[in-house]
Amino acid sequence: LPPPGLPQRAAATTLAQFPVVLPLPLSALRSAFPVLGNPLNYGRAVALTPKQFRYGFGNAVSEEESQRLYDRYSVAGPGRPLFQAAVANFNPASATKVNTKNPERGPLLVISGELDHTVPSAVAKASYKQYKKNPNVTEFVEFAGRGHSLVVDNGWRDVADAALSFVTRF
């Protein structure tokens, strides 16, 4: 196990894009467009409209549930991380750089939603392939029919159970 102070094990959901993760599906671009569409948003917090939230977060749940999630969880988010992720593959010193081969990292479960528009399955699988090069346990689970809201929508317990099952094995 890793030394004290480092995570002993982790379950990561909807991983942000980092350098060497090449897929960039159109759905991810569309989800990020409310922020990336205006370069001035780099230094701003940007709020999504209910329609934008529905596409990026609530696409795999009913319209009613998406609206409830929007009302409860939607807040303006910083633009900078999206801009950093967008140019990660063009900047070797990117703030999003990840040392996926760190041998001191503990076991990692990468969790994805099959219908996620914001971090599409192709991005999650490409991230997993990078993390899989680590000498420690790395596993991947994809939840069928689930979107980016998978940790807060009506099926959250399935995700929590999978994460708990993973971390209690180590």
Map each language-model feature to its residues.
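Glycine-rich, phosphate-binding/catalytic loops in enzymes
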Residues: P25-L29, A126-K129, V159
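Flexible "cap/lid" loop of the alpha/beta hydrolase fold
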Residues: P2-N41, Q84-A88
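Active-site nucleophile elbow and catalytic-triad environment of alpha/beta-hydrolase enzymes
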Residues: R72-T100, G106
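Conserved beta-strand scaffold positions in the cores of enzyme catalytic domains, especially
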Residues: Q8, V110, F140-E142
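Conserved alpha/beta-hydrolase "acid-adjacent" motif
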Residues: H117-A126
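Short beta-strand/loop motif that positions the catalytic acidic residue
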Residues: P103-E104, V110-S112, D116
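Catalytic active-site module of serine/aspartate enzymes centered on a nucleophile-bearing elbow/loop
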Residues: N134-F170
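Conserved alpha/beta-hydrolase catalytic His-Asp/Glu region
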Residues: A45-F83
